[in-house]
Amino acid sequence: MFKERIRIGEYVTRIEDKDMPPKFTMDGSLSPIKNPDGSITYFATDLGARPYCRMFKGTETSPFDSFVGEYFWNYNCYPEGYPNGLWAQTVYRCDDGMLIGIVHRENFSYTDKTSLINYHIGLGVSEDGGRHWFYAGDICGNCCNYVPRVHANMGGCPTIVKDGYFYSYFNEFAPGMKKCISAVRFSVEETVSALKNKKLPRVYKYSGDGKWDTKGIGGTGAPIITKSPYSDNPYNLSIDSHSKATYCKPLDCYLMTMQTGSHGDLVLYFSKDAEHWDEYMIIDSAEKDENGMSKFMLPYSCFVDASGEGRADSFEVGGAFWLHTVHKKISEYPYDEYYVKKITVE
């Protein structure tokens, strides 16, 4: 229905690992905000830095032209200091310029193997263009948090806006480490009002059958994606939400990428209602071996509008947009190749 109208262009940007910013290791999707002069500020997560949070300025196809500086967090009593961290994985710009960050939070130790490894999604707010942020708190967790030596990473919080609600998608883990893709939903109006007062909105996970009444903290969300190129078992899809989402105006539907680990593909999903994501296509791939596996995974993609019809934060794109992808060596995590290609809608 939708994928027949998608046209995938050739790469227009290829940045080899040696040409990436010095000591830079991609550890999250870039979040773009277009400035009045046409330049774009990109919020980045850099595992090679302490702290992780960086801002770059560039163009639609060249995100690392200049280093702006760090952006800083008020952790609001949440654990801070390496290896704990906050990542503004998706940044939404309000009409008054206030920025809302959909945040990936980690609290664990790389050195103590008996430590609890905890992942959450939370909300942050900035009122100075993104240089300083306040972390209002966690809105979503999973039941495998607080279990020793369990690595239940919730992903990169790809987020859309539909009918006055944020929908943020994540890796859910049911008891027994059964992984699926689920979502949380929360009101845009309530979120803006709450964050202005450094508080949190009400948040509910997807419960299945069109219902949203499962607690964000303490409940287990139902699968919201049930198919992939590799499986029809929603708990064995081989997809991961370190990715991005947007609304495409000419298609009148929502788009969301999913990375696939050693399959080496980037899958583009389509949805009309933000709840059913049955249609998909492979939109980028790394070179594979004779067994169909790749030395590269493709996490940390993002959308940047190329039509002039989308939002400055790329929560909406027009009939042409740029797809940014990272080809990251699975056996050598700091190794990144950065690619940009143009996608058009017919």
What do the predicted segments below correspond to?
Residues 1-84, 92-148, 162-238, 247-294, ...:
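Beta-rich carbohydrate-recognition and catalytic domains
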Residues 29-32, 88-90, 156-158, 242-244, ...:
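Conserved beta-strand position repeated once per blade in WD40 beta-propeller domains
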Residues 149-153:
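Acidic/His-rich structured neighborhood in mature extracellular/periplasmic domains
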Residues 299-305, 311:
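C-terminal structured interaction module
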